[in-house]
């Protein structure tokens, strides 16, 4: 969520920066709600002051033995104030809730270093890394035989989309034997690298979260249609009550679309000691996405799935050091690809292509020879205080005062897409797949996967 103080002090700058993201901020609605909030708050404070003054006046009148009629007149005014104050407080809470709803739908402001642009066509390539020779286009040289896509390569090795479709429908995969082992090896390697070399603490997190958690990290309310909602069976439909028998509100639950949600929420509604920053957390989890709006795209294979695995990296950083942390995290994701000997490039996203909560994002794109193109395999973002403000995540600064942390997240990596990249880049003319050296210890010493 954006800083309300910034909106009040420098609204036009905020509007201009949002416009660079293709977002038109509703100035009229904001001004209407803000004016109402100020008026109601001023009136509330005035009535509270009047209540206190009347209480003092009643004491003084009684103390000096004023006539009963005079005392009763002041008491009558005092007794009428609670109802008026309750109405004002309710109106203030309602207005503040409407303001919060408005701000919850507004994306983060782009950092000054983010290039202006309307779409992915205007993203900027920062660098690329190739493990071998390049052709005249600056991409990996041809393999020297007819390239097959990961579906054709993977099916003889245990990748089964037909069975997955019978079990669950479209956009799911079933793996057995060598393929399942390679998928597991990739995840284990990524976790070991992030924990053993890069200093992240491994976490095991829930796969189901409450809606309030998703509001904190920014998935709700904007991306509700992209989430899988959890429907409980058994007796959970019975209404819950508190100790007095009053019905309790039932909070919706969802499957996580990324473990960024659970890892970042570790600091929700907490104040971290400044000396403990940065926190580096990682987890390997399945991720669940409805892929609303992506019908017809990437329907073949594992590129766009309803369920996929990912090793996530999260850092909770001091505001003064968060952009150093961002570059560090990009390097951590790059190292995975380098050790797997997979060609990739780093792209700085333009203002129009960034995610909702991001102030600055780098995408890592891996080369897929069968598609003759680069495909995203990791996205690393600095959200600054955007998530922290929503979830009230703070640290104590040098003056021992609470201040919002900066939150960063990134894939280290998407396991399924890494599997796709290995199958396509490491395929051999006879249909076998060369196992990258770094994965061989996780594969029992296997150097080649053969149909």
From Swiss-Prot:
Enzyme class, broadest EC rank: ligase
InterPro entries in the record: aa-tRNA-synt_IIb (IPR002314), aa-tRNA-synth_II (IPR006195), aa-tRNA-synth_II/BPL/LPL (IPR045864), Ser-tRNA-ligase_type_1 (IPR002317), Ser-tRNA-synth_1_N (IPR015866), SerRS_1_N_sf (IPR042103), SerRS_core (IPR033729), tRNA-bd_arm (IPR010978)
Catalytic activity: tRNA(Ser) + L-serine + ATP = L-seryl-tRNA(Ser) + AMP + diphosphate + H(+); tRNA(Sec) + L-serine + ATP = L-seryl-tRNA(Sec) + AMP + diphosphate + H(+)
Localization, UniProt: Cytoplasm
Keywords recorded for this protein, A-Z: Aminoacyl-tRNA synthetase, ATP-binding, Cytoplasm, Ligase, Nucleotide-binding, Protein biosynthesis
PROSITE patterns: AA_TRNA_LIGASE_II
A GO term, aspect molecular function: ATP binding
GO CC list: cytoplasm
Entries under Gene3D superfamilies matching the protein: Bira Bifunctional Protein, Domain 2, Serine-tRNA synthetase, tRNA binding domain
Family: Belongs to the class-II aminoacyl-tRNA synthetase family. Type-1 seryl-tRNA synthetase subfamily.
Protein known as: Serine--tRNA ligase
